[in-house]
């Protein structure tokens, strides 16, 4: 009897834990909405969601949280007549949800659903706070995104790395671009434009990226973190004695330099940056 009770308690704990990201999503859409749904996660090698009915509650079933969230969006749109928009992520659900008359299933063989590019982060997201990012991550899940680019805080990594390499704050500020231009900086097109950034900026960005990654991983979304392209400050040869090439100007902007082989730094610096 004790064994059976223990198993039941463990199963209940798993169910509660599995449902929590979706519960949070539903509560952000409409307070109290999570009590109107039954959320079920089942194992499957195929990404899918199902809509079903149990008594007066709508069942949304899927193989992972992103699939289930996509099912939530499908139900709201096609059964409840609710259209969530990019600028309107809340709604008032009916007191009694429209029933699902027969089980409906949707699946995809598209394993990876990618989102964003570097320009998006500067055009649109440069000054987003956590409140706005929380909505965006919900939006991703509702639309089946599971592989978004996640570059918030790349400037923090570079700030820390260059500090370790002996660069002064003024020198670092001449290299790292301002928020609205970091997309082009990270694509090796310019240095320092739109800066300098205040010290508080880097602290905020580090905290924000940790919040973003935590929420993405709660959903099962896999963030795409930036790798290392060989970019270094334009003065890395004089400042650090590195073997670099000068790519010239981009639309009149001075570009960062590129590390060139042979140099032991070409293998050590990427590891150093990624670990930061």
Labelled PLM ranges:
Residues 72, 79-100:
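Short, structured interface segments
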Residues 3-13:
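Sec-dependent N-terminal signal peptides
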Residues 4-6, 74, 227:
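Composition- and surface-driven signal marking solvent-exposed, interaction-prone regions
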């Amino acid at each position: 009897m004790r064994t059976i009770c223990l198993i039941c308690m463990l199963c209940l704990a798993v169910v509660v834990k599995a449902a929590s990201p979706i519960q949070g999503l539903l509560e952000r859409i409409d307070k109290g909405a999570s009590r109107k749904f039954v959320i079920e996660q089942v194992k499957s090698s195929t990404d899918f969601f199902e809509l079903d009915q149990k008594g007066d509650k709508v069942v949304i079933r899927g193989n992972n949280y992103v699939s289930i969230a996509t099912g939530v969006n499908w139900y709201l749109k096609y059964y409840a007549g609710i259209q969530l928009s990019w600028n309107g992520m809340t709604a008032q659900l009916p007191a009694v949800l429209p029933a699902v008359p027969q089980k409906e299933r949707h699946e995809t063989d598209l394993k990876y659903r990618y989102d964003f590019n570097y320009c998006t982060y500067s055009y649109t997201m440069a000054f987003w706070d956590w409140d706005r990012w929380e909505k965006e991550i919900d939006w991703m899940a509702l639309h089946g995104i599971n592989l978004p680019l996640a570059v918030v805080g790349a400037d923090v990594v570079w700030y820390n790395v260059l500090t370790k390499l002996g660069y002064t704050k003024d020198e670092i500020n001449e290299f790292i671009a301002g928020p609205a231009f970091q997309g082009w900086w990270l694509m090796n097109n310019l240095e320092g434009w739109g800066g300098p950034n205040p010290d508080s900026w880097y602290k905020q960005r580090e905290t924000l990226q940790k919040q973003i990654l935590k929420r993405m991983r709660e959903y099962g979304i896999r963030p795409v973190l930036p790798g290392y392209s060989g970019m270094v400050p334009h003065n890395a040869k004089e400042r650090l004695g590195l073997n670099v090439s000068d790519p010239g100007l981009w639309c009149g902007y001075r570009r960062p330099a590129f590390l060139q082989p042979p140099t032991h730094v070409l293998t050590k610096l990427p590891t150093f940056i990624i670990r930061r």
